[in-house]
Amino acid sequence: MSYNRAAETRAPFGERQIFYHFPPRCSSKWQLLLNTDQKIFMPEITDTDKPKRLLSLDVFRGATIAMMILVNDPGVGGHIYAPLEHSKWNGCTPTDLVFPFFLFMVGVSVIYAMESKKATVAHSKLILKALKRTVILLLIPWVTQLIFHPDDGLAHLRLPGVLPRIALVYFIATVLYLKTSQKTRDWIFAAALIGYFIIMTFIPVPGVGYANLEPETNMGAWIDRLVFTPDHLWRESHTWDPEGLLGTIPAVATALFGIRVGSWLKCKDRDDQVKTNWMFTYGVLAVIAGLIWDLFFPINKALWTSSFVLYTGGLATIGLALSYWLIDVQGYKRFTYPFVVFGTNAITAYVLSGFIPHYMGMIKIGGHSIYQTLFAPYFSPVNASLVSAIFTVAVLWLVMWVFYIKKIFIKI
C-alpha cells in the first residue's frame, strides 16, 4: 500500500480525504471502493476519536501516592496512629497495602503504555527506554542519600529500597509483557509464588541449618548480607532489608497481577458491567486465596510473601474496580481532582516527599519548628502528629498542583 500526498484533499465538513492505492492483490475490510482506482476515504482523526484516558487509573494511583507520602512521614516523636504504622512482622495494616498497590498499578500502567507500541515499535527500542528509566530510578535514592547523609559516603549507602524495587519490578514486568504471551505470564506468576514459597519455607538457610521466616535468619536476609553486605542494608537493622533482593521475585508477581487486570480493563469486546464483575470476582477470590495461604505462609509485607501478593493484589483489584465503576462508568468525578494532581506526577511526588519534609523541618517560627508552633499546643500528641503528617501531604499537593496547572508532567 502506498500513500499519495498529492491526492490528499480537504473534503466537505472539514474532514480530510486521503487516497491510498492498493496493489491488486491487497484486500481489506476497511476499503471503500469509490472507483476503479481503488481509492478510500478516511476521516481525519480528532481528539474525540482517540481512546479515552481512564480517570480512575490516575485517581487510584494518586490516592496510593498520597498514602505513600503520609505513611513515610506519619508523625512525630512516636505518637502515631496504629493504622499508619507497618505491622511489626506478620499481618497487614492499611499502611502495608500502599506499596503493593503501587506496584500493582505499575503493572496496569505497563499495559496502557505498551499495548499500542508492542506491535509497531521495535521491542529492543522499548526495552532500552525501559532500561534507561530503571537506571534513573535506581540512581535517585542513592544520590539523595549522598546529599542528606554525606558523612556516610558510599561506604554506608543503602542499595535496596522502595525506588530500586520499583525500578527492577518495572523493568522485568515490561520485558515480560513485550516478550511473552498472557498465558506464559500467568504461568510465570504461579511459578514465582510457588517457587518463592518453596525457597523460603523448605530450603535450609546457610549458617542457620533450617528454613525459617524470622527477620534476621530467613533466606532473603542471608542473600542480602551476601550480595550487598550489612553496611548497605536498611539503617534500622543492617542485618536484613524490607526491600531485599529475593523479595523482588514476588514483587514482580504483584506487577504481573496488575498486567492481568489491566488487560481485562482494556479489553474492547467486553462491556463495562462485565469488566467490573470480573474484577470484583477475581479480587475477592484472590483475597480468599491469600487468607488461606496465610495459614501456611503468613501474610508479611517485609518478606513480600506469596500470600501477601494474593491478598494485597485482590484488594487492589477490588479498589480499582470500585474506582472504575464509580468514576469512568457512573461518572462520579467531583472528588477526583486532588488525586489526579498526585496521580499524573506520581513518581515526582514521591521523590519530592524525600526532600520537602526535610526542608520544612528547618523552618523556624519564633525559634520553634512548624510542629511545635502550629500543632503541638492545640492537639493531643497523637492528633498533633497526625495533623502534622497531613499538613506535609497538603504542602506536597500544592507543589504538585502548580506542576499540574502549568502542565509540567515529569516522565522518568
Predicted regions and their residues:
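Alpha-helical transmembrane segments and their immediate juxtamembrane cytosolic regions
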Residues: T9, N35, I40-I412
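Aromatic (phenylalanine/tyrosine) cluster motif
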Residues: Y3, F13, F19-F22, F41
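Hydrophobic residues within membrane-embedded alpha helices
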Residues: M1-A6, Q17-I18, D37, P94
